[in-house]
Amino acid sequence: LAMLVPALLVAGAANAAEVYNKDGNKLDLYGKVAGLHYFSDDASSDGDMSYARIGFKGETQIADQFTGYGQWEFNIGANGPESDKGNTATRLAFAGFGFGQNGTFDYGRNYSVVYDVEAWTDMLPEFGGDTYAGADNFMNGRANSVATYRNNGFFGQVDGLNFALQYQGNNEKSGLFDQEGSGNGNGRKLAKENGDGYGMSTSYDFDFGLSLGAAYSNSDRTDNQVHKGTHNTRYGDRFDATAGGETAEAWTVGAKYDANNVYLAAMYAETRNMTGYGDADAIANKTQNFEVVAQYQFDFGLRPSIAYLQSKGKDLGGLNGDNFDSQGNHHYANKDLVKYVEVGATYYFNKNMSTYVD
C-alpha cells in the first residue's frame, strides 16, 4: 500500500512551465515534489519514500525544418538523512536534432524503444510497469548510451503511423574474463550490464482513441554475464540461476484505448537471458509477462485504477527447493516472479496538485 499526501506537481511533463521562448529558442521546466509513504510487511519496502524530481526541455531553431533539442531529468530522494549523498539519480540526459517530418535523432540516457509499448500499461498511481521492464536492464526502460531515431507520421505520409530505431553501446564493468569494461561500468550489478544492442518499435494511432504497438530488442550479453551462467561447477552449466546465453532478447505487443475519459491498456512480452530476479545475480532464461490496466477520469477529479500484472519465469536454474524433485534430482523450475492485482485512485485538485493511494 502506498499513500501520497500530497503531491505537488510543479509542472507535469505534459504541461511544462515555459521559462523562455524567444527568437526560436525555448526552455521549459517541469518537476514534482512527492510526500510518499509505503505500508508493507517487508521492512525494506516500508516507510517514507518521499522524493523530488526536476527536469527541463530545451529547443533551438537552427534553420527551416532543422532544430536542436535536449532534455535532462533528475531525481532526489527525500527519505534519508542529510549525510546521505548517494540518494540521487539522473533519469534522463540526451540531446539531438529534429528534421521536421523526417524525424528526430538523439543520443544519451533516454527511454528504450521497447518501453514505447510498456509505457501504455505503466500508468498506475504508484506501482506497475515491473513485470520485465526496468531502468538499466538492457533496452527495457531508461538506459545509458542509446542513439535513437524516431519518426511520427511516417515522413508526413501516414498520419498515426510511428516507428523508432535504436542502438545501445556497451555498459559493463571490467571482469576476470578478458572483459575490458566501459568507463561507466564500475559498480554495476550483473543484471545492469549490457553489450551492444539494437531495438525497434512501431505503433499505429487510430483517430478514435485506439493504438496498437509492437517492439523488439536484441543485445549482446557481457562476458561477465555469460561466464556466470556457464560455469556452475556443482550441478552443471545449465542449472545455474544466471542464464548463460550469448544474447538477450525482448519482444512485446500491446494496445491501448484513451478516449471519452476511459483508459484501457494491455501488453504481452517475452524476454530471454535478460530479466533479473531475487536478491542475488539470478537472471531468468525466459520470462512471459502480461499487464492490463483500466482507469476512468471523472469530471470532478477522481481517477480510480485497477490492474493485473504477472511475470512467469520459465526454465529457471538455481539451488532453491523448486529446483529439486522428491528424489533430490536437480531440474529446471517455472515460477511467478511478479503477480499481483492493483487497486488505487488519484484525486486531482487541479492540474498541479493531486493525492493518491495505491
Please state what every model-predicted region is.
Residues I62-G68, Q101-F105, G156-F163, F208-A214, ...:
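Repeated loop/turn-to-beta-strand initiation elements of outer-membrane beta-barrel proteins
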Residues Y30-A34, Q71-E73, G108-N110, A164-Q168, ...:
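Transmembrane beta-strands of outer-membrane beta-barrel proteins
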Residues E18-F39, A43-N170, N194, S203-F206:
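Outer membrane beta-barrel
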Residues L1-A17:
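Gram-negative bacterial Sec-dependent N-terminal signal peptides
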Residues R188, E193-E342:
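Detector for outer-membrane/organellar transmembrane beta-barrel domains
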Residues M49-Y51, T88-T90, R142, G195-G197, ...:
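Membrane-spanning beta-strands of outer-membrane beta-barrel proteins
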Residues E118-T121, F177, Q225-H227:
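Short aromatic-enriched loop/helix-cap "lid" or pocket-rim segments at secondary-structure transitions
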